[in-house]
Design a protein with these regions (language model features):
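An acidic, glycine-rich, mixed-charge low-complexity segment common to nucleic-acid enzymes
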Residues: 1-120, 168-195
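Active-site metal-binding core of divalent-cation-utilizing nuclease and nuclease-like domains
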Residues: 121-128
């Protein structure tokens, strides 16, 4: 995969990330042993670079936020991209566009099984039978730190069914938008939430 092709895919995905996830909290509601539970996630501009699998080096201001701004402004130079593992980048870029719809399409959640990949440091996995996104807890929220082209059931100790997803802007106090509800779930069930 050539760097120009990689940049084009990432530019399109950055726009989708900006529209769907950036500066938003998502609340994933799920069943665990017939008890309704949830986790709260936070998506920041600085998280986008981690989801792509690439490394970004500039002469000055080498950070994930600068990369996100540069990619949206179409100012990323080929010489500043570092491809560490082309195979991993191909896998990530094959699913990145789909996974950025996680606010509408996540079906399962589970604890990461560290026996799957010893070097991968993530805690919660949210996804489908095609893709998964990993999250680590930072403060009160889980933030995304990886994407995997992998059936969630293969990389978690146990999966739980996502029954609803709520979204809000980070600055809002309350969740204002229901983006997904499992067709077998009634709203009244969701409001019996326990942490």
């Amino acid at each position: 995969m050539e760097k120009r092709e990689i940049i084009k895919i990432i530019e399109n995905c950055a726009i989708k990330y900006k529209n769907n996830l950036s500066n938003k909290n998502l609340l994933f509601v799920y069943y665990d042993k017939n008890i309704v539970k949830y986790i709260e996630t936070k998506f920041l501009p600085s998280n986008f670079l981690h989801l792509t699998g690439i490394k970004y080096k500039r002469e000055s201001n080498n950070n994930a936020i600068k990369f996100y701004k540069d990619i949206l402004d179409k100012k990323v130079s080929l010489k500043n991209l570092k491809i560490v593992n082309e195979g991993i980048i191909k896998l990530k870029l094959n699913i990145l566009n789909m996974i950025l719809d996680i606010n509408y399409s996540a079906k399962m959640i589970g604890e990461f099984n560290s026996n799957f990949k010893n070097l991968l440091r993530t805690e919660k996995i949210i996804g489908t039978n095609v893709y998964s996104m990993g999250f680590i807890k930072v403060g009160d929220y889980y933030i995304p730190n990886t994407t995997l082209k992998e059936d969630i059931r293969n990389i978690t100790n146990k999966t739980n069914r996502v029954i609803a997803i709520f979204s809000k802007e980070i600055k809002e106090k309350q969740y204002s938008k229901l983006t997904y509800i499992n067709k077998k779930t009634e709203l009244v069930q969701i409001f019996k939430i326990k942490k």
